[in-house]
């Protein structure tokens, strides 16, 4: 009788091991790379859309996707749908129509942009002097560019 008991005791030991006791099964390199990519994608999504902001951003994203297509609108309808511009784009507008040189217009516009100068208390004379320096630098630069252009093209062979 002692022998059957010993056999019974040995059988549970030879029984299949549980998940905890099994050595980890190694995945193929392809599966590992896929898992790494998916974890990288999740981390990048978390960086762009943290979980706290997702409930706030979701309605805006959904609204932006639900816009009806505007392909059927004519050019006239498109321009009527836009709000009027407050100021014309750069290079177009009233400053082209104003009379006077660049220096005079700069001196006149100084009070409007007093806050844009960031702590520099410049008088009108200083502003005009700075404008003169800028114009002189432009002239010198243009002369150098012309001289370079002429020197480059006056040779019988390219450099």
UniProtKB/Swiss-Prot annotation:
Compositionally biased residues, Acidic residues: 37-54
GO CC entries: nucleoplasm
Stretches the record annotates as Disordered: 1-99
Entry annotated with the keyword Cell membrane: no
UniProt keyword list: Nucleus, Transcription, Transcription regulation
Localization terms from the record: Nucleus
Domain of life according to the entry: Eukaryota
Biased composition (Basic and acidic residues): 17-34, 64-80
Function: May be involved in transcriptional regulation. Modulates various viral and cellular promoters in a promoter context-dependent manner. Does not bind DNA directly.
Entry's family note: Belongs to the TFS-II family. TFA subfamily.
Name of this chain's protein: Transcription elongation factor A protein-like 1
Species of the source: Macaca mulatta (Rhesus macaque)
Annotated gene: TCEAL1
């Amino acid at each position: 009788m002692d022998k059957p008991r010993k056999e019974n005791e040995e059988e549970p030991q030879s029984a299949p091991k549980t998940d905890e006791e099994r050595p980890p099964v190694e995945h193929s390199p392809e599966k590992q790379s896929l898992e790494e990519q998916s974890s990288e994608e999740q981390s990048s999504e978390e960086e762009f859309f943290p979980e706290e902001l997702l409930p706030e951003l979701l309605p805006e994203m959904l609204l932006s996707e639900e816009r009806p297509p505007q392909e059927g609108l004519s050019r006239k309808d498109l321009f009527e749908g836009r709000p009027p511009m407050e100021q014309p784009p750069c290079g177009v507008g009233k400053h082209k129509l104003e009379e006077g040189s660049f220096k005079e217009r700069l001196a006149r516009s100084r009070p409007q942009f007093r806050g844009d100068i960031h702590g520099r208390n410049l008088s009108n004379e200083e502003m005009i002097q700075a404008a003169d320096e800028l114009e002189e630098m432009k002239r010198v630069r243009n002369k150098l560019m012309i001289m370079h252009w002429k020197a480059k093209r006056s040779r019988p062979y390219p450099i």
